[in-house]
Curated annotation (Swiss-Prot):
Activated by phosphorylation at Ser-227 by PDPK1. Autophosphorylated on Ser-386, as part of the activation process. May be phosphorylated at Thr-365 and Ser-369 by MAPK1/ERK2 and MAPK3/ERK1. Can also be activated via phosphorylation at Ser-386 by MAPKAPK2. N-terminal myristoylation results in an activated kinase in the absence of added growth factors. It catalyses: L-seryl-[protein] + ATP = O-phospho-L-seryl-[protein] + ADP + H(+); L-threonyl-[protein] + ATP = O-phospho-L-threonyl-[protein] + ADP + H(+). GO terms for cellular component: cytoplasm; cytosol; nucleolus; nucleoplasm; synapse. This is Ribosomal protein S6 kinase alpha-3. The modification Phosphotyrosine is found at residue 529. It comes from Homo sapiens.
Length: 740
């Protein structure tokens, strides 16, 4: 099976040298090619002047620099800068873009040609998996390209550091990439620079192919290009020996990417550039046997040194690849329409967040002026239209040690103090390890909330990652900023001006089942979304469900406080895609995850019970002891008849009983709650006022007592280590730590 067989799925694998035989693996290479013209120093350049004309976004007016507000510097080099910009006029006002600004005077002729090429190719291209050029214009001294601002980072560095994936997951990305390449080929464009950093993720997790500076337009399939360009490890043999190459070269590079995604290593990588090129031309490569037969077959058909024999090079083009058995489960039409959910959603945060960009640039004041040429070891100008700054070797090693928490560590490199940007106001709430305060952003005078977390008491990493990854959901609290002063972490979020959901509902004199159904639908839909992503909240008490404004509309509900939330992870700490979870996760891990998800539903059942009757199911008031409350919860007994229940419909009672079932395995899942008749047929529910207990202070006290009893730090009863099924399965004699 793929990747699951490796303790570390991204460990280096031994690749045979040209002289080695491949006794342990099946050979996938055909005849070696000569190396008549290996010369990594040469590159053919067309010497010609160019004129970049304007390009205007369809349905919009002609653009110029004055229409864009500079927000941040994303990258800088000797002949230009890349800015995060906001359009300030026109029908797309407030839209964020990446603006690539090139100073004509410092552009070499070669770079001018490449800039023209980027612009011309992007004008022709309109595809869901290719970066889009929205505007192109020039002033007397500068060239401007206005492009998609892609916040997800590049596919490989993000997923290799954060996520465990399977062949099924890899298949999704390769399929989207195949459609993007085919579209370019249909326009007569050879991509030629296919490499990991040129495959970006948008905020949903779909790919975007970027950086067309090395692409070469050809008139037809027989037209060959001879320039020596691209990244050597991904080059096809015919590119290396400069005999001329066609679009078939891209399918070789496609195979290299596939091999790298499935094994974590490059198929051809020598100690230097020349040795790598020799390996590409002559080396035999053993096929990793943990790959499926379908994956091995596709790799063999892509790694043909004769480009005419390569899959995708025939008259049917990409259809040959789409028909291959490796892609048999892909619905290509649904894929093109972006109807297939990506395996992984990047932690992108707000639209204007630049967490994947180097703070060396993003901390600078944005000014549209020529950049000072960087020193020899400064960051490279751009990595394609994604503008993700390349890290130095030292930083690269540091990033590898950061591991799964790299996103948060990157956030915390901000040296600015929280109080420099915000004015702290009164307390909103106080917890055992944090305090929440109202604060005002000094630059904009806007109100926010800040959760100040004591790092000695709790690691906020998981909470911040979850908010970054899922905070764009309309009913999850939005993360605005993060600061770390060493002792405390300051998590800035939108301010919940509408207060707690239960407060508002209990104060509302007129409240019907139809309104209760709309509220529960909104919350459960959000919880279902989290559970589908492998996230459990684990603290869904009513005080963590609030309104962002005072409208009282279900759309303004926000689930807050992810301090106890968990993301499903593998033993090595990497996140797991749904496909990985289904295939390779230990039963006890899934059991725990299922239990936590069932606890989330139980909490929503308590909320529903209280909304309908005005009192809680397991506590009569704030004076009930924890023992009394826990005994009632454990018995699973609660009343659904008489008194205030007389005004409640039978379908509502049925849903409450199934959400509060004492056995978590028999409790409804979030998806089943959403399919319950009381939710589905909300428009048929009674609109008359529910007859509820009118004692909000008692309900608040009883609810607080309920969750206080549940969250008590009880001393666990420990049994002998040998009794543990996990210990028995692994043959462990001694357990050094226990996670409860």
């Amino acid at each position: 099976m793929p990747l699951a067989q490796l303790a570390d799925p991204w460990q280096k694998m031994a690749v045979e040298s040209p002289s080695d035989s491949a006794e342990n693996g099946q050979q996938i290479m055909d005849e070696p090619m000569g190396e008549e013209e290996i010369n990594p120093q040469t590159e053919e350049v067309s010497i010609k002047e160019i004129a970049i004309t304007h390009h205007v976004k369809e349905g919009h007016e002609k653009a110029d620099p004055s229409q864009f507000e500079l927000l941040k510097v994303l990258g800088q080099g000797s002949f230009g800068k890349v800015f995060l910009v906001k359009k300030i006029s026109g029908s797309d006002a407030r839209q964020l873009y990446a603006m690539k600004v090139l100073k004509k005077a410092t552009l070499k002729v070669r770079d001018r040609v490449r800039t023209k090429m980027e612009r011309d190719i992007l004008v022709e291209v309109n595809h869901p998996f290719i970066v889009k050029l929205h505007y192109a214009f020039q002033t007397e001294g500068k060239l401007y390209l206005i492009l998609d601002f892609l916040r997800g980072g590049d596919l490989f560095t993000r997923l290799s550091k954060e996520v465990m994936f399977t062949e099924e997951d890899v298949k999704f990305y390769l399929a989207e990439l195949a459609l993007a390449l085919d579209h370019l080929h249909s326009l007569g464009i050879i991509y030629r620079d296919l490499k990991p950093e040129n495959i970006l993720l948008d905020e949903e997790g779909h790919i975007k192919l970027t950086d067309f500076g090395l692409s070469k337009e050809s008139i037809d399939h027989e037209k060959k290009a001879y320039s020596f360009c691209g990244t050597v490890e991904y080059m096809a043999p015919e590119v290396v020996n400069r005999r001329g190459h066609t679009q078939s070269a891209d399918w070789w590079s496609f195979g290299v990417l596939m091999f790298e995604m499935l094994t974590g290593t490059l198929p051809f990588q020598g100690k230097d550039r020349k040795e790598t090129m020799t390996m590409i031309l002559k080396a035999k490569l053993g096929m990793p046997q943990f790959l499926s037969p379908e994956a091995q077959s596709l790799l063999r058909m892509l790694f043909k040194r004769n480009p005419a024999n390569r899959l995708g090079a025939g008259p049917d083009g990409v259809e040959e690849i789409k028909r291959h058995s490796f892609f048999s489960t892909i619905d290509w039409n649904k894929l093109y329409r972006r109807e297939i959910h990506p395996p992984f959603k990047p932690a992108t945060g707000r639209p204007e967040d630049t967490f994947y960009f180097d703070p060396e640039f993003t901390a600078k004041t944005p000014k549209d002026s020529p950049g000072i040429p960087p020193s020899a070891n400064a960051h490279q100008l751009f990595r394609g239209f994604s503008f993700v700054a390349i890290t130095s070797d030292d930083e690269s090693q540091a990033m590898q040690t950061v591991g799964v928490h790299s996103i948060v560590q990157q956030l915390h490199r901000n040296s600015i103090q929280f109080t420099d940007g915000y004015e702290v106001k009164e307390d909103i709430g106080v917890g055992s390890y944090s305090v929440c305060k109202r604060c005002i952003h000094k630059a904009t005078n806007m109100e926010f909330a800040v959760k100040i977390i004591d790092k000695s008491k709790r690691d906020p990493t998981e909470e911040i990652e979850i908010l970054l990854r899922y905070g764009q959901h309309p009913n999850i609290i939005t993360l605005k900023d993060v600061y770390d002063d060493g002792k405390y972490v300051y998590v800035v979020t939108e301010l919940m001006k509408g207060g707690e959901l239960l407060d508002k509902i209990l104060r509302q004199k007129f409240f019907s089942e139809r309104e209760a159904s709309a509220v529960l639908f909104t919350i459960t839909k959000t919880v279902e979304y989290l559970h589908a992503q492998g996230v459990v909240h684990r603290d869904l008490k009513p005080s963590n469900i609030l309104y962002v404004d005072e409208s009282g509309n279900p759309e303004s509900i926000r689930i807050c406080d992810f301090g106890f939330a968990k993301q499903l992870r593998a033993e090595n700490g990497l996140l797991m895609t749904p496909c990985y979870t289904a295939n390779f996760v230990a039963p006890e891990v899934l059991k725990r995850q299922g239990y936590d998800a069932a606890c989330d539903i139980w909490s929503l059942g308590v909320l529903l019970y209280t909304m309908l009757t005005g009192y809680t199911p397991f506590a009569n008031g704030p004076d009930d002891t924890p023992e009394e409350i826990l005994a009632r919860i454990g018995s699973g007994k609660f009343s659904l008849s008489g008194g205030y229940w007389n005004s409640v419909s039978d379908t509502a009672k049925d849903l409450v009983s199934k959400m509060l079932h004492v056995d978590p395995h028999q409790r409804l899942t979030a998806a089943l709650v959403l399919r319950h008749p009381w939710i589905v047929h909300w428009d048929q529910l009674p609109q008359y006022q529910l007859n509820r207990q009118d004692a909000p202070h008692l309900v608040k006290g009883a609810m607080a007592a309920t969750y206080s009893a549940l969250n008590r730090n009880q001393s666990p009863v420990l049994e002998p280590v040998g009794r543990s099924t996990l210990a028995q399965r692994r043959g462990i004699k001694k357990i050094t730590s226990t996670a409860l």
